[in-house]
UniProtKB/Swiss-Prot annotation:
Pfam families: GreA_GreB, GreA_GreB_N. It comes from Mycoplasmopsis pulmonis (strain UAB CTIP). GO terms for molecular function: DNA binding; RNA polymerase binding. It comes from the Bacteria. NCBIfam families: greA, PRK00226.1-4. Belongs to the GreA/GreB family. The gene is greA. SUPFAM superfamilies: FKBP-like, GreA transcript cleavage protein, N-terminal domain. InterPro entries: GreA/GreB_C_sf, TF_GreA/GreB_CS, Tscrpt_elong_fac_GreA, Tscrpt_elong_fac_GreA/B, Tscrpt_elong_fac_GreA/B_C, Tscrpt_elong_fac_GreA/B_fam, Tscrpt_elong_fac_GreA/B_N, Tscrpt_elong_fac_GreA/B_N_sf. Residues 47-75 form a coiled coil. PROSITE patterns: GREAB_2. This is Transcription elongation factor GreA. Keywords: Coiled coil, DNA-binding, Transcription, Transcription regulation.
Length: 157
């Protein structure tokens, strides 16, 4: 698998996508096939809005199944990190030395990013700047407004 195609996901997200794919294949797909069959029985397909709507829905379902298959075939599961060094899966507590504000977050893959849950992408400027560092290190964050941050803890260590 090429590095650029890898998609880092938590085990929970992998499970969620697998369940969605199963539902689309085993529930949604058969239902839309039935809708198409029923719409065909109404006669002239050239002016059949139900048929057109069902075919469009079928296309959306098939597109989503293909998308999920692509995601899952390229998925790399992010394990909880227990390392002293920051990496994917690490829970990090930092101190912004300019503002004096502390912040705690988990570094995750792009598909798992959720600022409301304090989950940031490993591709974000903050994560890119601190990956590989350890507790006690002071790091310059390469963001639009550069600032320095002190790493207070990594995985509660």
């Amino acid at each position: 698998m090429e590095e650029k195609n890898k998609i880092y996901l938590t085990q929970e997200t992998i499970k969620k996508y697998e369940e969605e794919k199963w539902h689309l294949i085993n529930v949604e797909r058969p239902a839309v096939i039935l809708e198409i069959k029923e719409a065909r029985q109404q006669g002239d397909l050239s002016e059949n809005a139900e048929y057109d709507a069902a075919r469009e829905k079928q296309g959306q379902i098939e597109d989503r199944i293909t998308e999920l298959e692509n995601i899952l075939s390229n998925a790399i599961s992010i394990q909880e990190s227990h390392s002293d060094k920051i990496g994917l899966g690490s829970v990090v507590r930092i101190l912004n030395q300019s503002t004096g504000k502390e912040r705690t977050f988990k570094i995750v893959g792009s598909f798992d990013t959720d600022p409301t849950q304090n989950k940031i992408s490993y591709e974000s400027p903050l994560a890119k700047s601190i990956i590989g560092f350890s507790k006690g290190d002071v790091v310059e964050i390469d963001a639009p407004d550069k600032y320095t941050t002190k790493i207070l803890s990594v995985n509660d260590k």
